[in-house]
């Protein structure tokens, strides 16, 4: 196995983890806000985790900055650096960029959607606006201290 191809596949997986962080975090914030507004304390581990996620300024800021970076780069017409690195590693390994292993191919097919540039700009911008709204609707606890 070529180590460059393994790194390229690892980058596809990392890219997916970033996508999941960006897309699923607002749902965690919303669920945490709904659970936080109940009078009874959250009983399950998942419920407590969601409330902590909603309240966490660090998580909220990290999410907002990640999404802002994506939106700005999309507006500028730039590819994500993870995509650029993945393609460069595949090229350096002598692999055609579209030629990937089974798992990497399926992950990449779901990740790299064919659409016009303006569609990505619109989708990312609307999503960013919705995330900004969650800061008002379900604000984090800015006074919260990090857990140790």
Give residue spans per PLM region:
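Hydrophobic alpha-helical membrane-insertion segments
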Residues: 62-87
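Alpha-helical transmembrane segments and their immediate interhelical/interface regions
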Residues: 2-58
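Membrane-interface capping segments at transmembrane-helix boundaries
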Residues: 135-148
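Extracytosolic (periplasmic/ER-lumenal) interhelical loops and adjacent juxtamembrane/interface segments
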Residues: 78-116
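Helical transmembrane-bundle signal
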Residues: 12, 19-29, 66-74, 128-135
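Individual transmembrane alpha-helix segments
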Residues: 7-8, 106-138
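Physicochemical signature of membrane-embedded alpha-helices that form the seven-helix bundle of GPCRs
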Residues: 11-14, 62-65, 123
């Amino acid at each position: 196995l070529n180590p460059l191809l393994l790194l390229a596949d690892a980058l596809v997986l990392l890219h997916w983890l970033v996508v999941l962080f960006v897309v699923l975090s607002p749902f965690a914030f919303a669920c945490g806000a709904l659970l936080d507004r109940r009078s009874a304390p959250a009983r399950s581990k998942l419920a407590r985790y969601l409330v902590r996620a909603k309240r966490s300024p660090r998580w909220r800021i990290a999410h907002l900055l990640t999404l802002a970076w994506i939106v700005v780069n999309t507006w500028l017409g730039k590819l994500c650096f993870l995509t650029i690195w993945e393609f460069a590693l595949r090229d350096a390994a002598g692999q055609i960029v579209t030629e990937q292993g089974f798992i990497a191919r399926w992950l990449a097919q779901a990740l790299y959607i064919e659409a016009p540039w303006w569609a990505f700009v619109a989708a990312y911008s609307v999503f960013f606006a919705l995330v900004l709204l969650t800061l008002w609707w379900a604000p984090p606890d800015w006074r919260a201290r990090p857990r140790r």
